[in-house]
A protein has these predicted regions:
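Class I S-adenosyl-L-methionine
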Residues: 47-120
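M14 metallocarboxypeptidase catalytic domain recognition
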Residues: 1-2, 8, 78-82
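Short beta->alpha junction loops
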Residues: 75-76, 127-129
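Mixed-charge interfacial surface used for oligomerization/domain docking
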Residues: 3-12, 17-45, 108-124, 130-278, ...
Length: 391
């Protein structure tokens, strides 16, 4: 059933493999959702061999990086998107929302836009201004709204609102892969170069930017947990969702999942039960304005701080983490100060009211392309809020 207003018809969804989206989440988000989704894989080149990401996994990328072999990536061709669009048209879709990694990080959006001119049906291409499960949650929101019978405009806006609400932060062993790939400049690379300091980064308005510095992976887990709970408390109305990304550090990822799931209270999912997924991802591996026209739109961009914004309530054990993260406020070797005061304020703001997740925190494996750019040792946390379709 098409809702009033906008462009009617069955709406398909296309994304790319940087979403790192576990297949189990797609299958569980709405009845028959998988039939409405196509994933266009980016291409990975290891040495002189190029393969689509769904044919060359993240483990191969990690091995190549460990051996010092050059790894590069490239966008899907417009022809790959045309094929995906037409496959959905053959499945009965009359319009498509094509949701992709930030234009500032990848030219995938440009490829999708070129393909939309040849597809022969209505395609709305959306720059998510993010990547990873922040993009993946946008895809899940789009699938839910499509399955609820909403038109392409409402489906696209649900995806935009989810991605705009998202907050992504991650720890990396080294900034060198990001520097080589042009995702962070030389000045940014210096952020993690002094002594044994390890960088925490964030996706801020579509680009990768420094967030904090820690001295060990263990401290990174604690900092990411405090940060994620504080961000989730300020996301606004809707279903709060959370994901943890990793490849090589699965044990640390589980610690972070447990911290988020234990320091919070997983709420009931759409089927009345808390849900989680730990699996390889599909494909291998701006915000919206207010809309006063009624329930056919998912709502405005969620209020709340960006990753470096004002503190919010954190989990009940956050106060114990102050000593571990407060050292970030001490002068660093380059004379600047870290964000220890802010971290301590976040921890001190802990309250007895726990964050409630719409589903249990998801553990999502990094895909090959994301691994190529952040390194196999990356560990990330993503929080977002998904608007629920009315009715």
């Amino acid at each position: 059933m098409a809702r009033a207003g906008g462009r009617a018809g069955r709406v398909g969804v296309v994304t790319d493999s940087t979403a790192c989206l576990p297949a189990e989440l797609v299958a569980g988000c709405a009845p028959d959702a998988a039939s409405l989704l196509r994933v266009a894989p980016l291409n990975v080149t290891i040495g002189d061999v190029t393969r689509p990401e769904d044919e060359l996994g993240a483990d191969a990328v990690a091995s190549a990086q460990a051996e010092g072999i050059a790894v590069t990536t490239s966008r899907p061709s417009p022809a790959a998107f045309v094929e995906a669009y037409r496959a959905l048209a053959d499945a009965g879709c009359t319009s498509i929302v094509s949701l992709h990694a930030s234009q500032a990080l990848s030219s995938t959006v440009s490829s999708a836009r070129l393909a939309s001119l040849e597809a022969g049906l209505d395609v709305e291409v959306v720059d998510s201004r993010t990547l990873g499960m922040a993009l993946g949650f946008g895809v899940l929101a789009a699938l839910r709204w499509s399955q609820a019978g909403y038109d392409v405009d409402a489906v696209a806006e649900a995806a935009r609102a989810t991605c705009a609400s998202s907050r992504t932060a991650f720890y990396v062993d080294s900034l060198e892969p990001l520097r080589r790939g042009g995702r962070i400049g030389r000045a940014g690379a210096l952020f993690g170069s002094a002594l044994s300091i390890k960088p925490l980064l964030q996706v801020d308005d579509g680009v990768i930017a420094p967030l904090a510095r820690v001295r060990s992976r263990g401290k990174a887990v604690e900092r990411l947990g405090t940060w994620a709970l504080a961000q989730a408390e300020n996301l606004g109305e809707g279903e709060r969702v959370c994901a943890v990304h990793s490849l090589q550090h699965s044990e640390l990822a589980q610690v972070l999942v447990d911290r988020l799931g234990g320091g919070a209270s997983p709420g009931a999912g759409r089927d009345g039960e808390a849900r989680s997924a730990e699996a390889s991802s599909t494909g291998s591996s701006g915000g919206t304005g207010d809309d006063a026209t009624g329930p056919a739109r998912p709502g405005s961009r969620a209020a709340g701080p960006r990753a470096d914004g004002a503190p919010g309530a954190a989990g009940p054990d956050a106060a114990d983490q102050v000593g571990d993260v407060a050292a970030l406020g001490a002068p660093s070797p380059d004379g600047t100060r870290g964000d220890g005061a802010r971290a301590a304020a976040e921890a001190d703001a802990a309250s007895s009211s726990a964050v409630r997740w719409a589903m249990a925190p998801v553990q999502a494996r990094l895909g090959a392309v994301v691994t190529a750019h952040v390194g196999a040792g990356a560990l990330g946390a993503v929080v977002a809020v998904m608007p629920e379709p009315p009715g």
